[in-house]
Amino acid sequence: MKASIINKLDSLSERHEELQALLGDATIISDQEKFCAYSKEYSQLEEVVSTFNRWKKLHSDIEEAQILLDDPDMKEIAAEEIEANKAEIEQLEQNLQILLLPKDPNDEYNCFLEIRAGTGGDEAGIFAGDLYRMYSRYAESKRWRIEELSANESEQGGYKEIIVKISGEGVYGQLKFESGGHRVQRVPKTESQGRIHTSACTVAVMPELPESEMPEINPADLRIDTYRSSGAGGQHVNTTDSAVRITHIPTGIVVECQDERSQHKNKAKALAVLASRIVQVEKEKQAQEQADTRRNLLGSGDRSDKIRTYNYPQGRVTDHRINLTVYRLDEVMNGKIDELIQPIITEYQADQLAALSDQN
């Protein structure tokens, strides 16, 4: 492992010890804000420091075992121990490099998930409903909370568009690679000839930004319309104009929210989604301007950015970004999508490591 990496790990270990002492200080304990901040920093360093300590211990064990190589009775055991420790050290060094990668500060935030039906008419709307169910089941398995903000249901079931907020630990970091075009190939229930149709939906995942990070939005740039919201089949029809539609005139971004019975609450939620969308648009613009030659595994949420195909006749799901195919479509549609999400995260980390080594 490079000396620069070891120096970095040494400084993190020192900081970890310093934080441990601070968290036992009565003055810090009585200051709730500082105590919470230090506790968070301490827990963030825990994994990298414990991994580094294990790495150092194995090196120490190898040095001790090398002394025993001169002992005829212990030589064989010592050689086996050295070989095993070297293999573990190699794995730990890979883990440490990943742990040292720059963290996306947004990864710990809640997120807004938008699903829109694309090409394919009614079948695309039904598929949007299937995707929403898939993400809902996944969120339930993670003990995350889903809050529906806006839903435009399609006539044959499913949604023309649905926007939800998902809250929980590390939500955005887990779901951010879901942005992009999702394509389904199957025989629709309304198809009498048994022909396979291809339909598509777009998914966009954006972090819910804290107020301190929200962009300043000029009220003069907004057009705010109110209307009466209604649930499925006209249920829960409000007698007041509580639903809110906000148009950001400079970008043309439109956000609707009809979740709450209070117009004020709907407006606040719509503004939060709008702020996240504005930031996302700016990020995508910067990424295009940089014209990065590396693969951008982080989808844009653009319809043309096809990331995944769900093929029902073959029971397979293919992620086109990393050429990954799994033949467990039923499980995937029931929310078991970790086997699709984790390989993308791993590949993204590998790309980051490659970029860092190029810089060095």
Curated annotation (Swiss-Prot):
Compartment list: Cytoplasm
Positions where N5-methylglutamine occurs in the chain: 235
PROSITE patterns: RF_PROK_I (PS00745)
Main localization, broad class: cytoplasm
PTM info: Methylated by PrmC. Methylation increases the termination efficiency of RF1.
Region (Disordered) residue spans: 285-309
CC terms in the record's Gene Ontology section: cytoplasm
UniProt keyword terms in alphabetical order: Cytoplasm, Methylation, Protein biosynthesis
Compositionally biased residues, Basic and acidic residues: 285-295
Superkingdom of source: Bacteria
UniProt GO MF annotations: translation release factor activity, codon specific
Family: Belongs to the prokaryotic/mitochondrial release factor family.
UniProt function note: Peptide chain release factor 1 directs the termination of translation in response to the peptide chain termination codons UAG and UAA.
Protein name per Swiss-Prot or TrEMBL: Peptide chain release factor 1
Lineage, broadest ranks: Bacteria, Pseudomonadati, Pseudomonadota, Gammaproteobacteria, Pasteurellales
